[in-house]
Swiss-Prot record:
PANTHER family: 50S/60S RIBOSOMAL PROTEIN L14/L23, LARGE RIBOSOMAL SUBUNIT PROTEIN UL14. This is Large ribosomal subunit protein uL14. One of its GO terms (cellular component) is cytosolic large ribosomal subunit. PROSITE patterns: RIBOSOMAL_L14. The gene is rpl14. One of its GO terms (biological process) is translation. It comes from the Archaea. Part of the 50S ribosomal subunit. Forms a cluster with proteins L3 and L24e, part of which may contact the 16S rRNA in 2 intersubunit bridges. GO terms for molecular function: large ribosomal subunit rRNA binding; structural constituent of ribosome.
Length: 132
């Protein structure tokens, strides 16, 4: 996984509810853990745009509910700062479910995704309709 160019402020922590931005059948996801976070004692792991997280499906089709899956954060409400000084924030917190090869499980992604996600995950960028 390559480093992001933007200064991403981590806007989500363990237990946060995010919307699912693809058509896998899941509607709402709960963040269980963050990949690669080795924190301090009693400190919640935080996640931001482009981070890979483990999620549990809280709302969706009966086949998808209560499954534990991997996902990538593609939108967050907390603003992030880009190298040119602009700040970007979205209307909601959203994630895309991925498989073990880091390919999206769905065939389409609803809504825009951040450019930082497109740089790190090319397969998600090719599926997305809008990159901001």
């Amino acid at each position: 996984m390559e480093a992001l160019k933007a200064d991403v402020t981590k806007g989500l922590e363990r237990g946060s509810l995010v919307t699912c931005a693809d058509n896998t059948g899941a509607r709402e996801l709960k963040v269980i853990s963050v990949m690669g976070s080795s924190g301090t004692k009693n400190r919640h792991p935080k996640a931001g745009i482009g981070d890979q997280v483990t999620v549990s499906v809280t709302k969706g089709t009966p086949e998808m509910r209560r499954q534990v899956l991997e996902a990538v954060i593609v939108r967050q409400r907390k603003s992030i700062r880009r190298p040119d000084g602009t700040r970007v924030k979205f209307e909601d917190n959203a994630a895309v479910i991925i498989d073990e090869m880091e390919e999206p499980r769905g065939t389409e992604i609803k809504g825009p995704i951040a450019r930082e996600v497109a740089e790190r995950f090319g397969s998600i960028a090719s599926t997305a309709t809008m990159i901001v």
